[in-house]
Regions:
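Acidic, glycine/proline-rich Ca2+-coordinating loop motifs
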Residues: 7-208
Length: 208
C-alpha cells in the first residue's frame, strides 16, 4: 500500500511540473517553408571517386553568413553548400525570404567552405567573400569576392582585388580598423588554407 501511494505522489508531482512548464510563454516558433519562403538543404552525394576517403573534409559544412545587402535594416542570409556553392536569401520582412542567387548574379560551383559579409570597398554596402576548396580545377577552387552593385546584384571581382586564392581555403577573417595589420587605414584579410595533398586519406582508400 505504501509503495502504491509513493508512485501516485510521484505522478502527481510530475503532473504539476508539466503544468508549471505549460504556463511559461513560448520563446520560439518553428516556421515552415511555406510561411517563410526559406528552404535549404545541403545535399552531399557520395560516389566511389568522391567521398570521405578521397577528401577528408567531405562532410565539413561552410557555415552561414548574415548581412544586410540592401541597407533596409533587415538581415539577409547566405547559406554555404558543399557541392553546389550556396544560396543567397533576401529578407523581405515579416520573417519572409526570397532565394535570389540567380538574379543576384551569384553563381558558385564546387565546395564553399566559408562566407564573410564585409564592405570591402567602403561604399556603405555589404559585399560577400566566399572561400572555396576541394575542386581539382583551379577555376572552381578560386575564392570569390562578390562586390555589391547596390541593386541586389553582385559582380565577382576577386582577381581584380588580388584575393582569388586557390589554395584550398576554409576560412577568412577581415581585420577591422582596430586591428589594421599595417596601420595604413585599409581593410586587411587573413585566409586560412588546409593541406593541398591528401596522401593519408588516399592510402587508406587504396587499402580497401
Amino acid at each position: 500500500l505504501l509503495f502504491i501511494l509513493s508512485c501516485k505522489d510521484k505522478e502527481t508531482a510530475k503532473k504539476k511540473e508539466i503544468e508549471a512548464f505549460s504556463t511559461i510563454p513560448t520563446l520560439f516558433t518553428l516556421l515552415n517553408q511555406e510561411e517563410s519562403g526559406f528552404y535549404f538543404m545541403n545535399e552531399v552525394n557520395q560516389s566511389e571517386a568522391f567521398n570521405i576517403m578521397t577528401y577528408e573534409y567531405f562532410y565539413n559544412g561552410g557555415g552561414v553568413g548574415i548581412g544586410d545587402i540592401n541597407n533596409d535594416g533587415l538581415p539577409d542570409i547566405f547559406m554555404t553548400g558543399n557541392t553546389f556553392g550556396g544560396r543567397l536569401y533576401l529578407n523581405k520582412g515579416n520573417l519572409e525570404f526570397e532565394q535570389i542567387s540567380g538574379s543576384a548574379n551569384i553563381f558558385t560551383r564546387g565546395f564553399t567552405t566559408d562566407v564573410s559579409f564585409v564592405d570591402i570597398n567602403d561604399d556603405g554596402y555589404q559585399d560577400i567573400y566566399l572561400c572555396k576548396s576541394m575542386a581539382g580545377e583551379i577555376e572552381y577552387r578560386e575564392n570569390l569576392l562578390y562586390i555589391n552593385n547596390q541593386n541586389n546584384t553582385f559582380t565577382n571581382k576577386a582577381k581584380e582585388y588580388g584575393i582569388a586564392d586557390a589554395g584550398f581555403s576554409n576560412q577568412s577573417v577581415f581585420f577591422d580598423n582596430d586591428n589594421d595589420y599595417d596601420n595604413d587605414g585599409d581593410l586587411d584579410l587573413y585566409v586560412m588554407n588546409h593541406r593541398a595533398d591528401f596522401d593519408n586519406a588516399h592510402s587508406i582508400y587504396d587499402t580497401k
